[in-house]
């Protein structure tokens, strides 16, 4: 009889237009669940993540955001585009976290070259109408489709990091180890399901992130979709619940993109889009960030029963509309400012 192995694979997905606070949630889960591998899916260095540790902020674009947990291998899946310059700078920046010794870059990763970045920034349609980050991902993906894109195995500077991420991840799952897969950007930026044409250059849902790191759908145990109480968006495109900059400032919400430095547009929570995002990703759980911005009384609260009634009603409505439990709640930027209800499922 075939032995049944308990699945221990979790995918983290953004449920809006990116910048939902996935970095904070990933850091928290890594600290609590202690995965053996943290694997990054997604497009490439067009998405930035901010990780706050002990009052210090790290803005990263290539290395998995779970890097503070030093016991895990850090993997970049074959579906991810790699900018060697950005990657090597981050390896150096994060040397205190032993990133160099833990990093595995799949040898099949596509490579972004300078020509791709130049094309991205000079293309009037992409730069002005769509609002691209200028990181070269779109043009590089074009070359990938044409089968002329270089791969990581062709780049001398990456030789020491090369490996087979699919094998690493599947072997870890076969051993019953925890594996965390990081998605980037957000569901509503998906090339297929987002606000086309104001989208990124590939799909950004859970199924694509699984494919990016080389695992099949039956290996996935949990899909945690991350929402923030006041969604934001960088660049052009529809934003049904958008508020004015003045309204955002009155709420104390002034944010800038990690990659572009552009001011983020801010809106009110869209329950219907949240429902759709949960469906598209097959969400099993929801992580909610920025509850302290929704209600300042919730700042730093670590127990659910100490939240305000206003906050509880908001959480209950999210669960009712989406049909998915809210299990992780962030009440501040630091890792310990978190309510974890996963054991109550």
Swiss-Prot record:
Subunit-structure text: Homodimer.
A single GO cellular-component term on record: cytoplasm
Protein species of origin: Methanocaldococcus jannaschii (strain ATCC 43067 / DSM 2661 / JAL-1 / JCM 10045 / NBRC 100440) (Methanococcus jannaschii)
GO biological process, one term: 'de novo' AMP biosynthetic process
Cited SMART domains: Adenylsucc_synt
Family (UniProt): Belongs to the adenylosuccinate synthetase family.
Enzyme class name: ligase
Protein known as: Adenylosuccinate synthetase
Annotated SUPFAM superfamilies: P-loop containing nucleoside triphosphate hydrolases
């Amino acid at each position: 009889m075939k032995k049944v192995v308990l699945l221990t694979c979790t995918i983290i997905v953004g449920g809006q237009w990116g910048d939902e606070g996935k970095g904070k949630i990933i850091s928290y889960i890594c600290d609590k669940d202690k995965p053996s591998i943290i694997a990054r899916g997604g497009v490439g260095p067009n998405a930035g993540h901010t990780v706050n540790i002990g009052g210090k902020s790290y803005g990263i674009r290539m290395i998995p955001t779970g890097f503070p947990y030093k016991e895990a291998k850090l993997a970049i899946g074959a579906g991810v585009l790699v900018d060697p310059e950005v990657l090597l700078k981050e390896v150096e920046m994060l040397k205190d976290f032993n990133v160099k010794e833990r990093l595995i870059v799949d040898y099949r990763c596509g490579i972004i070259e300078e020509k791709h970045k130049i094309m991205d920034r000079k293309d009037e349609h992409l730069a002005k109408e769509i609002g691209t980050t200028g990181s070269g991902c779109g043009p590089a993906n074009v070359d990938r489709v044409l089968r002329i894109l270089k791969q990581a195995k062709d780049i001398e500077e990456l030789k020491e990091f090369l490996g087979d991420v699919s094998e690493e991840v599947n072997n870890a799952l076969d051993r019953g180890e925890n594996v965390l897969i990081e998605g980037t950007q957000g569901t509503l930026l998906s090339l297929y399901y987002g606000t086309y044409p104001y989208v990124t250059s590939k799909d950004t849902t859970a199924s694509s992130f699984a494919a990016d790191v080389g695992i099949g759908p039956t290996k996935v145990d949990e899909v945690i979709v991350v929402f923030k109480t006041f969604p934001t968006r960088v660049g052009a495109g529809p934003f049904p619940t958008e508020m004015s900059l003045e309204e955002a400032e009155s709420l104390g919400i002034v944010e800038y993109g990690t990659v572009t430095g552009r001011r983020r547009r801010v809106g009110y929570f869209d329950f219907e889009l949240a429902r759709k995002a949960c469906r598209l990703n097959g969400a099993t759980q929801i992580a909610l960030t920025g509850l302290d911005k929704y209600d300042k009384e919730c700042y730093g609260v670590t127990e659910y029963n100490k939240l305000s009634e206003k906050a509880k009603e908001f959480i209950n409505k999210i669960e009712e509309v989406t049909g998915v439990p809210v299990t992780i709640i962030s009440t501040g930027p630091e890792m310990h400012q978190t309510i974890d209800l996963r054991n109550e499922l």
